[in-house]
């Protein structure tokens, strides 16, 4: 079941492929951000299609850093990234600072998790 979902994700967003059938780049990131990241991927793809760059788009690294998403991308031919894509990534990196990494609810910008998810650790 999970492999089928991963195949569908990779077919839709090839840059989520990390070379391992059972996992995608999405699986390496906090669960609470999955919807946010998929929304970002949808917007990125819409722009990539306009510029005929879907096959050239790569994510070099994606991670949680300082309570927010850090998304490092490039084009495989090293041509400049269209500003529209850079703007999309920046928008979602900022939004991620307000989304709980565990559940996806709103949270303070200076915390990794919302108060509900943080409660067991207090």
Positions of the model-derived regions?
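Short, intrinsically disordered linker segments that flank or connect zinc-binding domains
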Residues: 87-91
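Ser/Thr- and Asn-enriched, surface-exposed coil loops between beta-strands
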Residues: 65, 110-111
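Cys/His-rich microdomains that often coordinate metals
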Residues: 107-109, 118-121
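Long, charged N-terminal interaction/targeting segments
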Residues: 1-86
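Flanking scaffold residues of small Cys/His-coordinated metal-binding clusters
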Residues: 95-98, 108-109
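Short cysteine-rich clusters marking metal-coordination/redox-active sites
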Residues: 100-103, 114-117
């Amino acid at each position: 079941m999970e492999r089928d979902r991963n195949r569908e994700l990779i077919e839709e967003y090839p840059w989520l492929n990390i070379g391992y059938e059972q996992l995608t780049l999405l699986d390496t990131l906090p669960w609470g951000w999955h919807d946010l990241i998929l929304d970002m991927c949808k917007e990125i793809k819409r722009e990539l299609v306009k510029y005929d760059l879907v096959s050239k788009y790569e994510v070099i690294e994606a991670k949680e850093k300082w309570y927010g998403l850090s998304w490092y991308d490039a084009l495989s031919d090293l041509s400049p990234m269209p500003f529209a894509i850079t703007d999309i990534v920046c928008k979602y990196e900022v939004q991620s600072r307000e989304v709980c990494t565990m559940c996806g609810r709103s949270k303070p910008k200076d915390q990794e998790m919302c108060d509900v998810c943080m409660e067991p650790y207090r």
